[in-house]
Amino acid sequence: MKITMFFAALSAASGVFAAPAQAAAAAKDLSIGAGVGIGIGAGVGSYGYPYGAYPGWRLQLLPLRWLPLRRLPLRIPILPMVNTLCSVACAQNPRPAHLLIIKPLTPEQFLFL
């Protein structure tokens, strides 16, 4: 019983020391970006994200380790499962039927864009 409690305490202590390092690694590998703007030509909108020629909003959550060009000021997002891209085409047609919710793309699908 004492040995089990000792290992449980040791495991908890190691978790306390490992948690900040894991959180720092996760923060380094992820970039969260949100923006509101109007897309400007060629499918590239404000902040340099692939976007449509319509106003809207989007929330990006993407792993930077997948981005070979991550040091460029205009990052090209590869859209994994955790990424969400939502746009509302309110200027072209404000009807609710034109609410566009684009499902996340896999990296393989993004390569063909």
From Swiss-Prot:
Keyword Glycoprotein attached: no
Subcellular location per the Swiss-Prot or TrEMBL entry: Secreted
Positions of the UniProt region annotated as 2 X 7 AA approximate repeats: 59-75
Cysteine pairs bridged by disulfides in the record: none
Region annotated 2 X 6 AA repeats, chain positions: 32-45
Tagged with keyword Secreted: yes
Repeat region (Sequence), residues: 32-37, 40-45, 46-49, 50-53, 59-65, 69-75
Cellular component GO terms, alphabetical: extracellular region
Keywords: Repeat, Secreted, Signal
Annotated region (2 X 4 AA approximate tandem repeats), positions in chain: 46-53
Signal peptide: 1-18
Protein name: Protein USP2
Organism: Puccinia graminis (Black stem rust fungus)
